[in-house]
Amino acid sequence: MSITNVMNQGMTRRGFVGASVIACLAAAGLVSFAGEAHADGAQTRTVTDARGEVEIPANPQRIVDLSGNSDMLKIFGFDVVGTANSDAYDYTKFPAYLEEDLAGATILGYSYQDTMDIEAILALDPDLIIISGVQEKMYDQLQSVCPTIMIQLAQINWKEDVQAFAKVLDCEDKATAWLESYEAKAAAMGEKIRAEYGEDTTYLSFLASGGQLYIFDAAGFGMVMYEDMGLAKPEGMPQQENVSLPVVDYEGLAAIDADFIFAIGTDEDLKALNESKPYQMMRAVQDGNVVELPASPYFNQGYGCIGKDTLVSEFPYLIAGEDPAEARVKARKDMAEESADTEATDADDKQDEGAADDKSSSETAGKTK
């Protein structure tokens, strides 16, 4: 499936589905979950998905994810053995922001493909397979291999989607902790950017593709800037009701008055953009405040959890004009340090809790004597 088909499949707020955005039926109260202990001691959970009840491992170890949500599984603490979270422009590789997190997983295709190689899936010996409605026609065949659950795709609220998916795998606490950490990080980065570049400075991001401009408003890159980081939108944004990725021509783009522009596209599309007279007249272009980014991976990066997190970390380097590849290296280093700090804090908290419990036990024992 081409990137144009992906964009054509979802232009409205309700219809646009990023490669890594899901909402399971649990969000609407249509999925039920019940833990069940077998006589042999094996722990399972019963999930009622769009196709009926499925008994799945309580702690799956070999997940094959075809739904495009392997990044969510990663933040829940699962390592997938097979994935369809491939690059939107090259299905044989991972998007750059997922290379480290999905290292070792086998790429089985792209999440918008309705069929994938069943033999390749079998070879991975999965104990749980996760699909979206896109792959529904494979459901019965996959169910004969191992427990398979189908996640219904929709865009409602990405944070609720994360929690709903976490509920399926009984890891809501991890999802909540990650979301709280991300929200705090994005807000802090927004404050840092506003302090350095001005409270009222405005930012615009768009994808140039085939002579059309897809404006990231309430989706992707734009959602990260406006909703997560709290940066200001420019005047002249296209008003298209219930559309999160509005499409404009060059004249429509030139009507948007932004202080900074993030132009995303292939080399060919960016060349055509730079040759456009209306684009050349934009204030940000004339001021030299344009950051050009490759379509792979930045078209999709603002949709998934890890992509969003990485983009927030990259932002100060990108806006300063650093090469995107170098910005990613520095961002990943920053993220590794953040993770280490969090782990150290968690360890200290557990140690303090343990000491408090020991003290309480000692005091109780003393009173008993």
Predicted regions and their residues:
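N-terminal secretory signal peptides
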Residues: 1-11, 15-31
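C-terminal segment of N-terminal export signals and the immediately downstream linker at the start
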Residues: 10, 33-46, 53, 364-368
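Short helix-initiation/N-cap motifs at beta->coil->alpha
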Residues: 49-51, 109-118, 240-250
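Extracytoplasmic substrate-binding proteins
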Residues: 53, 138-210, 302-346
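Basic- and aromatic-lined ligand-binding clefts that recognize polyanionic substrates
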Residues: 62-76, 177-232
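A short, structured surface patch at a secondary-structure boundary
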Residues: 66-120
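Proline-aspartate-enriched helix->loop->beta-strand connector
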Residues: 118, 122-131, 147, 258-259
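Structured C-terminal subdomain patch of bacterial secreted/periplasmic proteins
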Residues: 123, 140, 256-369
